[in-house]
Amino acid sequence: MTRLGKQFFTAPTLALTERLLGKIFVRITPSGTVLKGRIVETEAYLGHNDEACHAWRKKTERNRVMFEAPGTLYVYFSYGCHHLLNIVTEPEGTAGAVLIRAMEPVEGIPCMQERRQTTVETALMSGPAKLTSALGVERSSSGRDLFGNEFFLLDAPSPQPSMICTSTRVGISRSRELPWRKYLADSPHVSKGRPS
């Protein structure tokens, strides 16, 4: 499979929520373990006209990574206990990102099972906090990009349009009406969260 380069991220954020589905997210751990997950669920967040976005008011120290170049990882700590993985998708200087909500485990499953303390494959990455735990992604990963040797995306066949579902986003209290969540209809690895 071919690595996806910077050109892939020139598409608009809302288009990337769909284009990222089916792609393979890869993390190489410091010990050399290869961890791979197929993206099956995404959500878009934009700095303008989206009150659910961390950067909708202004740039701060907390959200500054959202203003960096497309393909940069934005990892934040939610509710004081969960790391969530986003990929920056807007041109540098403009805030926007796609939250990776769920993946299907592809490689490195024993390592993921150990991290997650479960052998049930559908429970390994079926939620945004679960997948960061399985991959060992923490805030220290924020600001790194997908074009090096630790994190990258591999191209893979895109799902058929009929298999892609759209809904409002999960677990938000503002801008709840925006239909900016995409997921694969046939995947048992999609999160169980209900749209807002």
Swiss-Prot record:
Signal peptide: none annotated. Keywords: DNA damage, DNA repair, Hydrolase. It comes from the Bacteria. One of its GO terms (molecular function) is alkylbase DNA N-glycosylase activity. One of its GO terms (biological process) is base-excision repair. The keyword Signal does not apply. Its EC number is 3.2.2.-. InterPro entries: Formyl_transferase-like_C_sf (IPR011034), MPG (IPR003180), MPG_sf (IPR036995). Belongs to the DNA glycosylase MPG family. This is Putative 3-methyladenine DNA glycosylase. It comes from Chlorobium luteolum (strain DSM 273 / BCRC 81028 / 2530) (Pelodictyon luteolum).
